[in-house]
Amino acid sequence: MVVNYHNEPSIDFTDSKNVESFKEALKKVKGELNQKIPLVINGEEKFTKDTYQSINPANTTEVIAEVSKATQKDVDDAFEAANEAYKSWKRWSHKDRAEFLIRVAAIIRRRKEEISAVMVYEAGKPWDEAVGDAAEGIDFIEYYARSMMELADGKPVLDREGEHNKYFYKPIGTGVTIPPWNFPFAIMAGTTLAPVVAGNTVLLKPAEDTPLTAYKLMEILEEAGLPKGVVNFVPGDPKEIGDYLVDSVHTHFVTFTGSRATGTRIFERAAKVQDGQQFLKRVIAEMGGKDAIVVDKDIDTDLAAESIVSSAFGFSGQKCSACSRAIVHKDVYDEVLEKAVALTKNLTVGNTENNTYMGPVINQKQFDKIKNYIEIGSKEGKLKQGGGTDDATGYFVEPTIIANLKSSDQIMQEEIFGPVVGFVKGKDFEELLEIANDTDYGLTGAVITNNRENWIEAVESYDVGNLYLNRGCTSAVVGYHPFGGFKMSGTDAKTGSPDYLLNFLEQKVVSEMF
């Protein structure tokens, strides 16, 4: 019997017992760092001579793992294994595949502290963010297991005299999962196991910055008894195997979360039919955002400031849904800005091993990019708070507020993916929405207002996939807030939704005459 779905709880770190328990998990994980991570192809580990290092972004002298690098030949072997495994995996009943996922979720639940501790070191996640990431991974897995059972019998269609008709779902084949580093467990696990529970097989190419977190899932899948070849683990250099994975004649689908540049490249390459290819490839992509919180007049300015600060600086602004733009009515602009600055001054930044509010950004490339945007923004507007950067021991960037910007300014148009928020003023609600929509992206947004008519207008006109009232624009919850965006934010294939598994299924009709 499968119990009703509910969200996995976080860990209450106001309880000293939980703090001590998590410190023990951190100590244990720290003692196991600098381990060697293999490829996993057809259930067999393969260690390669050519490797790269995953490092702690909060302490760049600390090596997290030595990671084997897959070659194109390894990818070929992985496709061969996945194609062979597909022959039997697709014949598992919907119920058996769903029950397998529930077993996986149970193991993750038991190892939640360990997985969270890995993310503290490998992704620089604060404790709450790391635990939330692991918990969300459990949520995705539990939710998709139940979704598969609901789809097991297909959907009803009409019969007529002498004719019985069935409409049902079947898996589509082998695909590729390319997850991001910012939610290295939740998104990775969800985008890998959604196609798997639907009966497909997968090549998982983990994010280069967080391979150990992804390898933990491989350990768990083996412990749960996943048949060989259903999920194959192929870390490697995207320049060598990225296009190769997408272009392969064996690739039926690609699930991708990451940058716009890479996402659009995947779309372009997947559209080309290769020699011998007998199907059209599907691309399920989430490509970021330039998310905004719109603040109306006559509102609770404390709520507005708190929503902006938490959405802009949680996990150092490295969320696809992070608030990068604060679009504020002129009547409350100065007050909201002042309160946001005051709140930001109290945020702690440092090594997240010590449970700071903010940790590092993920790598040198991102650090340099964010630093450059701060310099640009300081010229375009007025630096009100933060702006400091330090990469002496880790990739640390102060939470930064830049005011007096125009919607057309560079830092108001381009995705920064760091702890930087720009403030812009609007004369009325209509202009606030115009500014909010003045972007290529359409992922998340929030509106702080007490005016019901303005909220109704925002629901109709604010062009984002996830819109929130009187709260921040981050923290979508699986099963409650299916997540995905419009425009250049991706394909709006809402993760954690009743429809998500349909991306990995074909619809078949069988008509019997009597």
Swiss-Prot record:
Catalytic activity: L-glutamate 5-semialdehyde + NAD(+) + H2O = L-glutamate + NADH + 2 H(+)
Matches recorded under InterPro entries: Ald_DH/histidinol_DH (IPR016161), Ald_DH_C (IPR016163), Ald_DH_CS_CYS (IPR016160), Ald_DH_CS_GLU (IPR029510), Ald_DH_N (IPR016162), Aldehyde_DH_dom (IPR015590), Proline_metab_enzyme (IPR050485), RocA (IPR005932)
Organism of origin: Staphylococcus saprophyticus subsp. saprophyticus (strain ATCC 15305 / DSM 20229 / NCIMB 8711 / NCTC 7292 / S-41)
Coiled-coil annotated spans: none
SUPFAM superfamilies membership: ALDH-like
Pathway stated in the Swiss-Prot or TrEMBL entry: Amino-acid degradation; L-proline degradation into L-glutamate; L-glutamate from L-proline: step 2/2
Lineage: Bacteria, Bacillati, Bacillota, Bacilli, Bacillales
One CC-aspect GO term: cytoplasmic side of plasma membrane
A single GO molecular function term of this UniProt record: 1-pyrroline-5-carboxylate dehydrogenase activity
Family designation: Belongs to the aldehyde dehydrogenase family. RocA subfamily.
Gene Ontology terms describing biological process: glutamate biosynthetic process; proline catabolic process to glutamate
Keyword list, A-Z: NAD, Oxidoreductase
PROSITE patterns from the UniProt entry: ALDEHYDE_DEHYDR_CYS, ALDEHYDE_DEHYDR_GLU
Active site annotation, chain numbering: 286, 320
Gene it is expressed from: rocA
The EC number(s) this enzyme carries: 1.2.1.88
Name of the protein: 1-pyrroline-5-carboxylate dehydrogenase
NCBIfam families, sorted: D1pyr5carbox2, PRK03137.1
